[in-house]
C-alpha cells in the first residue's frame, strides 16, 4: 500500500520540502570555539555548511569546523596554522531546513 501511494504521489507535492538560507556572520579573530545564533528560528534544521570568508590578503591558513547545530544556531571552532598571526574572518553559512 505504501509503495502504491508513493508511486501515485504527484511530484509537485514534494517541491520545496527542503529549504535553504544563507548568511555571513560577524568578525572572528581569535582561535577558539564560538556560537552563532541564526537571525530567525527554524522549525527543523537538517544541516549547516560553513566556509571561511576572508577579504584581503590572508597572513596564514584559517579553518573553521562545525561542532554542532540546532534550530536556533550553530557552534564552530576557528583554527589557524599560526595562532599568533590569526586573521579576522567571517563565516559564510548555509542552513538546510524544512
How does the language model describe each region?
Residues 1-44, 77-98:
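Extracellular receptor-binding modules and their adjoining Ser/Thr/Gly/Asp/Asn-rich linkers
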Residues 11, 62-69:
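Short, exposed beta-strand/loop patches in secreted or surface proteins that constitute
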Residues 50-52, 62-64, 83, 88-90:
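General "foldedness" signal
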Residues 64, 74, 93:
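A broad, low-specificity signal marking well-ordered, structured residues that form hydrophobic/aromatic
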Residues 69-78:
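Cysteine-clustered segments with highest specificity for TGF-beta superfamily mature ligands
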Amino acid at each position: 500500500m505504501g509503495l502504491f501511494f508513493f508511486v501515485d504521489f504527484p511530484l509537485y507535492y514534494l517541491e520545496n520540502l527542503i529549504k535553504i538560507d544563507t548568511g555571513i556572520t560577524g568578525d572572528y579573530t581569535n582561535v577558539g570555539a564560538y556560537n552563532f545564533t541564526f537571525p530567525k528560528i527554524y522549525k527543523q534544521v537538517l544541516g549547516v555548511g560553513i566556509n571561511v570568508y576572508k577579504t584581503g590578503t590572508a597572513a596564514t591558513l584559517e579553518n573553521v569546523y562545525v561542532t554542532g547545530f540546532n534550530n536556533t544556531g550553530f557552534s564552530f571552532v576557528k583554527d589557524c596554522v599560526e595562532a599568533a598571526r590569526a586573521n579576522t574572518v567571517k563565516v559564510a553559512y548555509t542552513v538546510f531546513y524544512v
